[in-house]
């Protein structure tokens, strides 16, 4: 059975379940920062990640979720590579299916986090690239 939904309701609901890199950076500085989960492969994790993120590949997420995130109501942000990757959607669905109530997908993923000039960590150290003018707000 199809239920009608207004455009307003659709977009309001959508914003409840997604965040972007800039908003995630601001949320991480708040009093209740989200747990950030990287669901990419080991190789991708080694290449670069959001500082402070926890690495739980999608294939392991259902099994490890309760040890990584014991509070079902805590804020969680899930990311993968970028806009062409649906790993964060699958990860967020896994968590929601397990009963987590405050899960958001990071739209743009790691790619847009880095392109916005936010700090990244890799196995070789910490870095920050100049913001890409096509993705980062001009000051």
Regions found by a protein language model. Give the residues of each.
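Short, flexible helix/strand-to-coil boundary loops that buttress conserved ligand/catalytic motifs
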Residues: 28, 49, 65, 117
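Flexible, polar/low-complexity N-terminal or interdomain linker segments that lie immediately upstream
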Residues: 1-47, 122-139
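Short, hinge-like loop/turn segments at secondary-structure boundaries
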Residues: 54, 72, 119-124
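Conserved beta-strand scaffold positions in the cores of enzyme catalytic domains, especially
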Residues: 36, 53-55, 103-105
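Glycine-rich, highly charged phosphate/nucleotide-binding loops
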Residues: 56-65
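Catalytic cysteine-centered active loop of the rhodanese-like fold, especially the PTP/DSP P-loop
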Residues: 65-113
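Short loop/helix-cap segments at secondary-structure boundaries that form the rim of catalytic
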Residues: 45-51, 113
């Amino acid at each position: 059975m199809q239920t009608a939904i207004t455009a307003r309701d659709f977009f309001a609901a959508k914003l409840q379940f997604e965040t972007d890199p800039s908003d995630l950076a601001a949320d991480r500085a708040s009093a209740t920062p989200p747990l950030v989960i990287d669901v990419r492969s080991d190789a991708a994790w080694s290449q670069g990640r959001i500082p402070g993120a926890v690495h739980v590949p999608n294939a392991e997420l259902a099994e490890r979720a309760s040890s990584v995130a014991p509070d079902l109501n805590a804020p969680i942000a899930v990311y993968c590579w970028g806009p062409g990757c649906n790993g964060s959607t699958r990860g967020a669905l896994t968590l929601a299916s397990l009963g987590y109530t405050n899960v958001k997908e990071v739209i743009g993923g790691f790619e847009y986090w880095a392109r916005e000039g936010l700090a990244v960590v890799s196995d070789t150290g910490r870095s920050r690239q100049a913001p890409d003018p096509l993705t980062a707000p001009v000051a």
